[in-house]
């Protein structure tokens, strides 16, 4: 049984309320302080580096306007939904599937919708401060059960909310949402187990699932580990009734929170990054020894900047969120607790998590067997480590000094990375150290050692003091604040040479949006900041985001264009610009000479406008056109990858089953025409496609409308990513959609004038809406029943 576990009802209600808000306030205030210098420096438009700059600011601002109906108009087609399809997301993507991983289910995002769109870039820091505060509040609620003095729960809340994981993941922003909400889920589980509360666990299951379905997979795994470890340690007695209660609330919570789940699952099943079942030894061992060292030290040392490694030259380290560091204390308190307990559930939980971290297939189970390595579940064991730390600090019988010395020696041992002799095989010369970033290494090591020394010193002089918890909390807050400033500063100023003009380009793009020529077309950019197309509300070939339409992930690789977390086809792939209806290219005046040297013919300089340089694509083809020829998939796959964009301007690629049904409307491309693929023939192909293109093409927030007049029945091609959520109508009649060109779309239209409408609604959304709509009133009735029963039995209001 947990040594300090006590019933919640024994805690004075007023005191708990006060301490809860104290935890919230301290964590939020500390976050506000360490963000403040950067907030002032940036004039309120805080920008950091990498994903935060390119995705988080941009996505929050863009989606704030999108959900309010800004941008493209509603579809005029009868019964079409509103705000379901985003043209500014890559080549166009369903908004729910593209953003449910980032923000679409986040309560923090929906809170930000109350603000004007123009405020969002300036509100990123206040929102982050709120998230840190919410994380502290949730951690306090969880931890107070396991301490005698609630001041230690406040201390543990600060350790968790300001942990290395939380500070590191400011870089990704939406990961902090998960850090903030998870403790409430664990607290609610404890309340159901120990206090027999009804409805609370189901509610927080729903909130966490809705917030981020991807992280929820890891939370389910962790809760199973947590439950089994507590059960085997005899922390509670499981009865059939209690198990049924937990199972029912788990199912009910998933049902309430599954609004985004069904569409997300259907989309993920088409995503090649999700799972790789052919790994073999890769299931059991990491390929590089350095990966193991990095994992072990990530629980002890403060984290590196997300995109900079101090030591490691091999393994997957950058951007992985690999840190479980607790500020000031590191693992010293947790190890002290470990040594003082036997058959303890917290020890078992941490031990299982450590094994999972070291076995690839177990590690990947926390994020849906994603084929890429990440450690983005470490926030969960971090909460348990915080609990172990405060338990050790509160117990006067626990030896705190010896574990701290041991952790200190491990930190000092990392100095070997700086002094180990290295021989250059090429020159034969010798040098010392294998450090990749010596300055950052010594800063990180210095903070780690300084924290441990302060920890030992403060424990030595204050442990017998009645205000020990408050003083340690103050020390943790000061240490976390200073380290967070340094950590963010390293990441921010490490890319200052590339990001210093970010705000200027983003704000200039808002002006350019009003000055671009009217019409619905795509754009391209050259060597400017990521996702500028979203500030212009235009579909852009250069896009940085992980969860665009899955068919994009098959279309681009088929052309030899890499597509992992971003789309960035090289400018030398000129034929792709005609195929995808790119009419304008945007760069900066400083990059004009470089662009003209690198690009092929076919671009005409127009003007310098709003800080940008604008070019027109001479080979622009309006969206929606027909072909005279087709090629089979086998022929396409046998062609030269680098010339496939040219081939796609000449012929449509049909799947084998579609050749039988639709090949009659086209002629199979003769072999002689498979080789004549160069720039001059491309310009003629563009002219041919342009001559048989749609007279009207209108983008809307649920898809698009087009009009075309054909001499004979033919397939009309649209360079829009194929998605099961689309329904096509030709002259008002529902029509089959063909998947062509390994990821794009076409429909069959009759001779004469045709009116074409593509209407998007995320596949699976109808079913998820029904489940959620049924589950919510069931939950309300369920909670009301137990509230009523409690009141009847006690004769007083009850908190259920």
Say what each PLM segment does.
Residues 7-97, 497-504, 515-530, 534:
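Hydrophobic alpha-helical membrane-insertion signals
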Residues 37-146, 151-183, 207-211, 305-317, ...:
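Active-site lumenal/periplasmic loops and adjacent helix-entry segments of GT-C-fold
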Residues 12-16, 659, 665-800:
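Active-site-proximal, structured, solvent-exposed surfaces of multi-pass membrane proteins
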Residues 196, 215, 346-505, 751-800:
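Contiguous transmembrane helix-bundle modules in multi-pass membrane proteins
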Residues 53-57, 61-74, 107, 242-246, ...:
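Periplasmic/ER-lumenal interhelical loops and adjacent helix-loop junctions
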Residues 97-101, 479-499, 512-582, 620-685, ...:
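Extracytoplasmic/lumenal acceptor-recognition loop(s) of multi-pass membrane glycoenzymes
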Residues 236-244, 334-357, 468:
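Membrane-interface helix-loop-helix junctions at transmembrane boundaries of multi-pass membrane enzymes
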Residues 27, 128, 132-145, 151-232, ...:
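Membrane-embedded helix bundles of polyisoprenyl
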């Amino acid at each position: 049984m947990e040594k300090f576990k006590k019933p919640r009802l024994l805690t004075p209600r007023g005191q708990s309320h006060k301490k809860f808000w104290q935890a919230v306030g301290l964590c939020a205030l500390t976050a506000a302080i360490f963000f403040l210098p950067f907030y002032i420096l940036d004039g309120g438009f805080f920008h950091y580096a990498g994903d935060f700059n390119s995705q988080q600011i941009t996505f929050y601002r863009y989606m704030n306007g999108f959900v309010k109906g800004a941008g493209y108009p509603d579809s005029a087609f009868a019964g079409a939904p509103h705000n379901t399809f985003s043209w500014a997301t890559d080549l166009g993507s369903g908004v729910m599937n593209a953003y449910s991983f980032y923000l679409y289910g986040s309560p923090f995002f929906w809170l930000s919708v109350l603000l004007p769109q123009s405020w969002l870039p300036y509100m990123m820091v206040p929102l982050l401060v709120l998230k840190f505060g919410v994380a502290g509040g949730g951690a306090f609620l969880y931890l107070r059960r396991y301490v005698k003095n609630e001041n230690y729960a406040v201390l543990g809340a600060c350790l968790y909310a300001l942990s290395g994981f939380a500070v590191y993941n400011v870089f990704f922003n939406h990961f902090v949402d998960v850090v903030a909400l998870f403790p409430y889920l664990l607290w609610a589980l404890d309340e159901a187990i120990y206090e027999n509360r009804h409805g609370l666990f189901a509610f927080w299951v729903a909130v966490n699932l809705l917030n981020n379905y991807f992280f929820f997979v890891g939370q389910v795994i962790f809760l199973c580990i947590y439950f089994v470890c507590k059960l085997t340690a005899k922390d509670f007695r499981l009865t059939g009734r209690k198990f049924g209660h937990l199972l029912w609330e788990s199912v009910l919570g998933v049902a309430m929170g599954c609004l985004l789940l069904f569409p997300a699952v259907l989309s993920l099943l088409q995503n090649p990054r999700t799972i790789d079942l052919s790994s073999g030894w890769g299931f059991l061992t990491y390929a590089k020894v350095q990966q193991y060292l990095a994992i072990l030290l990530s629980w002890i040392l403060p984290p590196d900047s997300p995109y900079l490694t101090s030591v490691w030259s091999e393994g997957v380290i950058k951007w992985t969120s690999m840190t479980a560091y607790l500020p000031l204390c590191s693992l010293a308190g947790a190890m002290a607790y470990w040594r003082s307990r036997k058959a303890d559930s917290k020890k078992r939980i941490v031990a299982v998590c450590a094994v999972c971290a070291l076995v690839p297939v177990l590690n990947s189970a926390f994020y849906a067997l994603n084929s890429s390595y990440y450690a983005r579940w470490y926030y969960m064991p971090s909460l348990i480590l915080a609990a172990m730390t405060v338990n050790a600090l509160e117990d006067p019988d626990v030896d705190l000094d010896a574990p701290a010395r041991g952790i200190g020696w491990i930190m000092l041992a990392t100095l070997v990375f700086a002094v180990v002799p290295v021989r250059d095989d090429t020159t034969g010369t010798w040098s010392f150290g294998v450090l990749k970033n010596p300055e950052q290494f010594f800063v990180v090591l210095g903070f780690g050692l300084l924290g441990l020394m302060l920890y030992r010193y403060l424990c030595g002089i204050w442990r017998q003091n009645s205000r020990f918890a408050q003083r340690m909390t103050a020390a943790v807050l000061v240490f976390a604040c200073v380290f967070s400033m340094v950590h963010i500063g390293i990441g921010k100023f490490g890319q200052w040479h590339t990001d210093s003009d970010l705000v200027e380009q983003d704000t200039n793009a808002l002006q350019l949006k009003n000055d671009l020529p009217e019409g619905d077309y795509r754009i391209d950019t050259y060597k400017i900041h990521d996702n500028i197309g979203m500030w212009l509300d235009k579909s852009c070939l250069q896009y940085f985001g992980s969860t665009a339409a899955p068919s994009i992930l098959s279309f681009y690789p088929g052309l030899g264009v890499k597509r992992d977390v971003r789309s960035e086809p090289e400018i030398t792939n000129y034929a792709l610009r005609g195929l995808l209806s790119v009419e304008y290219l945007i760069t900066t005046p400083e990059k004009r000479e470089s662009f003209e040297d690198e690009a092929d013919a076919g671009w005409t300089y127009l003007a310098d406008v709003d800080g940008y340089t604008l070019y027109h694509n001479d080979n622009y083809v309006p969206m929606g056109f027909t072909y005279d020829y087709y090629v089979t998939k086998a022929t396409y796959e046998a062609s030269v990858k680098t010339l496939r964009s040219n081939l796609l301007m000449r012929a449509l690629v049909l799947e084998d089953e579609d050749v039988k049904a639709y090949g009659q409307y086209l002629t199979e491309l003769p072999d002689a025409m498979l080789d004549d693929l160069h720039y001059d023939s491309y310009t003629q192909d563009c002219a041919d496609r342009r001559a048989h293109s749609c007279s009207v093409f209108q983008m809307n927030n649920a898809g698009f409308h087009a009009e075309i007049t054909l001499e004979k029945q033919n397939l009309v091609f649209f360079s829009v990513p194929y998605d099961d959520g689309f329904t096509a109508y030709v002259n008002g009649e529902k029509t089959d959609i063909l998947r062509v060109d390994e990821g794009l779309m076409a429909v069959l239209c009759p001779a004469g004038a045709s009116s074409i409408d593509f209407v998007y609604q995320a596949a699976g959304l109808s079913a998820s809406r029904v489940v959620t709509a049924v589950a919510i009133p069931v939950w309300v009735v369920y909670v009301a029943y137990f509230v009523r029963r409690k009141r009847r039995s006690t004769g007083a209001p009850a908190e259920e």
